C-alpha cells in the first residue's frame, strides 16, 4: 500500500505486523514517473502514492536478501496486489498536472 504519510500509525503497525515482511519508501519523482508510464501503457491514472505499491516486486528482484528469502517455487505461486485507489477522487485538472510532471521527469 502506498501511504501518503510520513509514518503509519502504531495501531496499524501492530495489526499488520504478522503479515508484513518488509517495507520501503520512494521519492515522489519516482511515483510521478510511474504515474505517466501507467497512464501511457494501460490508460490508468492513479494518484502518485498509489503507485508506490507497484514498485515492491522490482525492489525485491534487485535485493539479494529478498532473493534468498523467497524461493523460486514460492515466487511462482506469489500474487502481488496493489492497493490502487484514489485516482477517481483527484480532480481532472490536478491529475493532468501529475501526469505532466511525470512526463517531464521521464524526458529529463
Task: Give the location of each predicted region.
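Active-site-adjacent helical/loop segments in soluble small-molecule enzymes
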Residues: 7-75
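Phosphate-binding loop/pocket of nucleotide- and phosphate-handling active sites
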Residues: 54-108
Amino acid at each position: 500500500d502506498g501511504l501518503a504519510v510520513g509514518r503509519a500509525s502504531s495501531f496499524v503497525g501492530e495489526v499488520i505486523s504478522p503479515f508484513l515482511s518488509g517495507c520501503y519508501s520512494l521519492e515522489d519523482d519516482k511515483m510521478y514517473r510511474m504515474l505517466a508510464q501507467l497512464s501511457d501503457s494501460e490508460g490508468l491514472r492513479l494518484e502518485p502514492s498509489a503507485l508506490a505499491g507497484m514498485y515492491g516486486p522490482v525492489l525485491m528482484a534487485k535485493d539479494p536478501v529478498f532473493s534468498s528469502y523467497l524461493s523460486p517455487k514460492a515466487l511462482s505461486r506469489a500474487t502481488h496486489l496493489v492497493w490502487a485507489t484514489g485516482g477517481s477522487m483527484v480532480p481532472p485538472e490536478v491529475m493532468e498536472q501529475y501526469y505532466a510532471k511525470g512526463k517531464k521527469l521521464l524526458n529529463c
